[in-house]
Amino acid sequence: TGVQTCALPISYIARPGRFWISLIGAFFSLGITAGICEELVFRGMIFRYMEKTLGLKLAVIIPAILFAFLHIMNMQTFDLLDLVLLVLAGSSAAVMFTFYAVKSASIYPGALAHTLWNTLIIGGVFGVGDIVNGMRNESYIIIPIKSTSKLLTGGNFGVEAGLPAIVGYIAVTLLIGIFIKKEQMKLG
């Protein structure tokens, strides 16, 4: 992912006392690179191609699973539970972004949301727990997690792969799905 591409610049700029440089660096290297590139590839290219060739359901499911597995590279070590949580979380987040692209008829709103997510969470501004996106959490604002349960902490990927996050992705996806259905009912 774009995270590996940007690891060196971020490790240089994300130092205590250099908040604004860190924020700007995170925005450009992590946010834009990963957010826009992942949305372009997964929602803009793979999803659209599969939607035309395989139908809507497979076009949602297959890229979502690919998106999840791509993020395995972010984890230094993992066991079966870490992997299961990451695949569930990554797939759920990918489906959420896909529904957002379908609802808006564009990848740009999803790319903006993905960019902000990456900038704030992965870019070192805000983090929950000891691990963020498979890396040690060195964020400026850290909310500690007192639990050692991987179901809550997301294991070796971080809180983004925990059950609360997965429930959140699914809830947002269902909400977007309701809006899509309402629009279809108005048109149909």
Give residue ranges: language-model regions.
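Short, small-residue-biased leader/transition segments that mark boundaries at the very start
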Residues: 1-8
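Helix-boundary and loop/linker segments of multi-pass membrane transporters
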Residues: 13-22, 52-54, 154-155
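Alpha-helical transmembrane segments and their immediate interhelical/interface regions
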Residues: 17-24, 63-101
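Hydrophobic alpha-helical transmembrane segments
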Residues: 22-35, 148-171
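Residue-level signature of the transmembrane alpha-helical core
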Residues: 27-32, 36, 61-68, 83, ...
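Membrane-interface helix/loop boundary segments of multi-pass membrane proteins
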Residues: 37-62, 73-79, 99-109
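Functionally important transmembrane alpha-helices
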Residues: 81-151
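Membrane-interface capping segments at transmembrane-helix boundaries
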Residues: 176-188
